Swiss-Prot record:
Natural source organism: Xylella fastidiosa (strain Temecula1 / ATCC 700964)
Protein name: Glucokinase-like protein PD_0680
An example Gene Ontology molecular-function term: glucokinase activity
A GO biological process held by the record: glycolytic process
Keyword Protein biosynthesis: no
Length: 334
């Protein structure tokens, strides 16, 4: 069960948890649950726009205010973590270093975790009301679960059952090469290769990716783009006022279905797929109308096996914080 956040300060030891994306940072004070089976309790959840602040330290300092009792912090963020703790990412507006955060905020401990690794830990707290079933059986088989979602980039992680202490494998699936199936997709990828030697999956499956696909479609049809943002494209598609905007979302959903099917087979994710990220809940209706399921199952003889894999859309904005807190509490318990 996802905890209901409150604004009251906890009377038990607590820590700071943050979900840092390329566009927004969500922050909360977290109190440890009374048992490992209970979800952590969130207090005073706030959302900040990254573009409004010069650094993550500034955001966290604003949130902490006079909370001098909070001494520890866990941060979920996209990117690859180096051995020295710093994060390599193309999607954040500023560097991310636990050493700098610890010094800037006078904290005892700052831990970093991959955002989709954190989200994978939150699957234990999801309720049916937070999930939209897209395909497959209502009950999944036992086995690994795939977490994937487009936002500022494309995040992905694998949750692996392990006798009550699951293992989560963060990945950089969004940096793998973008595959193409149809003639149109091949033309799009060839166009994208005009000014680069590698087209990653997230070049199409992300917020910026929607704009990349739209511009490529415009170029292929020799027309000038009418929209300059993913939101404008989505609004035009919803209003039915621009055929290329509608086609952009169709191509986006086709790519998504095909790639999710590929990753399920690569990772053996028989435990199901959870689609998350900041974009898909906003594209719920185009996704439901799309060929997503058809493309997900279009894997030759393996399509029959994929029919037994449930795919669900996650609709809960605080799961990143909950998952980061779960990860941190598990770390402290070992």
């Amino acid at each position: 069960m996802i905890p209901t956040p409150t604004r009251d300060a906890p009377n038990i030891p607590s820590f700071l948890a943050a979900d840092v994306g390329g566009t927004h940072v969500r922050v909360s004070v977290v109190a440890a649950a009374p048992t490992c089976a209970s979800p952590p309790q969130l207090f005073d959840v706030r959302t900040y726009r990254c573009a409004d602040y010069p650094s993550l330290s500034t955001i966290l300092n604003d949130f902490l205010g006079t909370r001098s009792a909070v001494r520890d912090c866990v941060i979920a963020s996209a990117g690859f973590q180096r051995s020295d703790g710093t994060v390599i990412t193309t999607n954040l507006p500023w560097p991310l270093s636990p050493h700098r955060l610890r010094a800037d905020l006078n904290l005892a401990e700052v831990c970093l975790v991959n955002d989709f690794e954190a989200l994978a830990y939150a699957t234990e707290d999801m309720e049916p009301a937070q999930l939209l079933h897209l395909t497959g059986p209502a009950k999944a088989q036992d086995g690994p679960r795939l977490l994937l979602g487009p936002g500022t980039g494309l995040g992905a992680a694998l949750w692996i059952p392990n006798n009550g202490r699951p293992i989560v494998l963060p990945t950089e699936a969004g940096q793998a090469a973008l595959p193409s199936t149809t003639e149109l997709e091949m033309q799009l990828v060839r166009h994208m290769l005009n000014n680069r030697t590698h087209v990653p999956i997230e070049h199409a499956l992300s917020g910026p990716g929607i704009l990349n696909v739209y511009r490529a479609l415009c170029a292929l049809q020799s027309v000038l783009p009418q929209h300059a943002s993913p939101d404008a494209i989505s609004h035009a598609a919803a209003a039915g006022t621009d055929m290329l905007s509608s086609q952009t979302l169709e191509v986006f959903c086709d790519f998504l279905g095909s790639i999710v099917g590929d990753l399920v087979m690569m990772y053996g994710a028989q435990g199901g797929v959870y689609l998350a990220g900041g974009i898909l809940p906003q594209l719920r209706e185009p996704l439901l109308r799309s060929h997503f399921v058809e493309r997900f199952l279009n894997k030759g003889p393996m399509g029959e096996a994929l029919q037994h894999v449930p795919v669900r859309l996650i609709e809960h904005g605080q799961l990143g914080i909950v998952g980061a807190a779960r990860w941190y509490l598990n770390k402290k318990a070992t």
